[in-house]
């Protein structure tokens, strides 16, 4: 990482917060034709939050003042009891921060709704004008910012009913996420000297597309059901972090930045059926998988350049169970396996391929007077972790 100098800082923060919000909504629907409607909705939302952080700087105290104390949860009084002066005398007004955040949001949506016997479809657009104010006193600088933006998001929802027990649904929506006011402030927060945060006034809004498919069916005669779904989402100009290091102090600076390349996908299939006409013997299987890709920017050490960091997660899972059911007894055996693979292109030490296993059974006796007696036994195992203590049974 470099040849660092010794840097010592003792700081104590008190940060009371207060927040509230309220909303008012109205909806109107106008028939256009048979089973076709145009729906308008409006909602006003107001939100308020306040933070009043006091930072006390104990860096002037002799080295080792708190060396005899062992860290413990909520043990602040142990540290404050060693101060040589009243706590108020250590208050640093520059490092303390007071802020107020107000948002005024208008949600306006128009939706075309078509309702038929076999299918239903909703197509619409949502507009969201938003006005925000942010006031802050920090580092001797007074900030009073105002921002007005208009977010928009199209929506699509289609449902098809094959019969009373089988249906298909396809859904699409998109959202625009604006960076927060604090992320846009061009201010460096070094309250924690080793973990510095920095704003970025050049942030762009993030735009996310989401697609979902869902299908389920049920056959009463065989007590047979099937369900499957698939999700996919991708984000343009996602707001991630850029992490850099100071070669002199070893301090880490985190700044929000726009990154591209974030997407994820999930899918699953469930099948349940009885294997005899009486429904006494049953089997169930649930298969699932997901893939996630996240991007950020990282400086691996003080002398290297900032590089794009890609982290990928792959998860596969399977659960299988079988059961025997009568009017007074239910016996079930089940087992599951989950595989997770994570890969980081810059930090190979974080790459992992892990397995989790679970298997066992349960037994339930039905007794008179609506009473029951149950017991179960399961074994859980984990494998593939770098720390041997985590590879447990």
Give the residues covered by each predicted segment.
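Primarily recognizes Gram-negative and organellar outer-membrane beta-barrels
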Residues: 1-393
């Amino acid at each position: 990482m470099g040849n660092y100098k010794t840097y010592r800082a003792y700081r104590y923060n008190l940060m009371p917060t207060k927040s509230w919000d309220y909303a008012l909504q109205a909806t109107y629907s106008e028939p256009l034709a048979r089973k076709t409607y145009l729906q308008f909705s409006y909602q006003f939302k107001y939100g308020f939050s306040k933070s009043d952080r006091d930072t006390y700087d104990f860096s002037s105290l002799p080295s080792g003042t708190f060396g005899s104390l062992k860290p413990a949860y909520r043990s602040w009084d142990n540290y404050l009891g060693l101060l040589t002066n009243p706590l108020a005398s250590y208050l640093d007004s520059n490092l303390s921060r007071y802020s107020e955040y107000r948002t005024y949001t208008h949600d306006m949506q128009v939706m075309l709704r078509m309702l038929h016997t076999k299918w239903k479809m909703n197509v619409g657009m949502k507009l969201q004008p938003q006005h925000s104010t942010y006031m802050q006193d920090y580092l001797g600088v007074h900030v009073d910012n105002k921002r007005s933006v208009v977010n928009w998001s199209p929506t699509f929802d289609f449902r098809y009913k094959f019969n009373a027990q089988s249906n298909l649904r396809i859904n699409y929506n998109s959202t625009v996420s604006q960076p927060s006011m604090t992320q846009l402030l061009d201010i460096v927060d070094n309250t924690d000297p080793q973990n510095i945060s920095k704003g970025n006034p050049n942030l762009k809004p993030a735009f996310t597309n989401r697609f979902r498919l869902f299908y389920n069916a049920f056959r009463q005669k065989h007590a047979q059901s099937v369900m499957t779904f698939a999700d996919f989402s991708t984000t343009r100009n996602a707001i991630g972090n850029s992490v850099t290091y100071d070669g002199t102090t070893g301090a880490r600076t985190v700044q929000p930045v726009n990154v591209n390349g974030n997407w994820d996908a999930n899918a699953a299939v469930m099948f349940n059926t009885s294997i005899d006409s009486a429904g006494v013997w049953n089997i169930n299987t649930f298969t699932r998988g997901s893939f996630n890709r996240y991007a950020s920017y990282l400086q691996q050490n003080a002398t290297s350049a900032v590089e794009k960091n890609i982290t990928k997660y792959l998860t596969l899972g399977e659960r299988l169970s079988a059961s025997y059911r009568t009017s007074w007894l239910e016996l079930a055996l089940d087992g599951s396996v989950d595989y997770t693979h994570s890969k980081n292109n810059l930090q190979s030490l974080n790459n992992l391929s892990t397995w989790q296993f679970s298997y066992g059974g349960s037994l339930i006796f039905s007794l008179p007077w609506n009473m029951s007696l149950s017991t179960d036994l399961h074994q859980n195992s984990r494998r593939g972790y770098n720390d041997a203590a985590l590879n447990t049974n």
